[in-house]
Amino acid sequence: MKTFFLKEKQINKKWFVIDAEGLVVGRLAAFVATLLRGKHKPEYTPHMDCGDNVIIINAEKVHFTGKKLKDKIYYKHTGYSGGLKKTTPDNILNGKFPERVIEMAVKRMLDDGPMARRRFENLYVYSGSEHKHQGQQPEKIDFASLNRKNKK
């Protein structure tokens, strides 16, 4: 029996929408990373972008477990000497772009490389309850009902 490899024409991408209100960030990010990679599909092929498109709404209403909201630190460097910047999830969620918390979590759960960057482009995160992808007729996923620990 030969090993099955998915061809470009055989890829069938679906659209999913997830309401992130009250959901735990890490659990949501792990689930979304699996959807973006396509690991939930039987025809998964590592070298092809066979994952689905995911829309996340209400990104500003996510939760962290424990004291991570205040104690977790995100680092970034400006490229200049002494340019190490620190911020907390609380600052980001109360700032101008609260959807970046989920974007960073999902991006860091994907592998590195050009394929991961292409897969990450299939993620659409919105801080409000509205999104502009109604034409794709996304399928709603009730992530909170999958496990009691998913919602806080």
Swiss-Prot record:
Keyword Transferase carried by entry: no
GO molecular function, one term: structural constituent of ribosome
A Gene Ontology cellular-component term: cytosolic large ribosomal subunit
Domain of life according to the entry: Bacteria
Keywords for this protein: Ribonucleoprotein, Ribosomal protein
Gene3D superfamilies: Ribosomal protein L13 (3.90.1180.10)
Alphabetical list of InterPro entries matching this protein: Ribosomal_uL13 (IPR005822), Ribosomal_uL13_bac-type (IPR005823), Ribosomal_uL13_sf (IPR036899)
Coiled coil: none
Gene Ontology biological process: negative regulation of translation; translation
Keyword Ribonucleoprotein assigned: yes
Function according to Swiss-Prot or TrEMBL: This protein is one of the early assembly proteins of the 50S ribosomal subunit, although it is not seen to bind rRNA by itself. It is important during the early stages of 50S assembly.
Listed HAMAP family: Ribosomal_uL13 (MF_01366)
PANTHER family: LARGE RIBOSOMAL SUBUNIT PROTEIN UL13M (PTHR11545:SF2), RIBOSOMAL PROTEIN L13 (PTHR11545)
Family that this chain belongs to: Belongs to the universal ribosomal protein uL13 family.
Subunit structure: Part of the 50S ribosomal subunit.
Protein name: Large ribosomal subunit protein uL13
Organism: Wolbachia sp. subsp. Drosophila simulans (strain wRi)
Gene encoding the protein: rplM
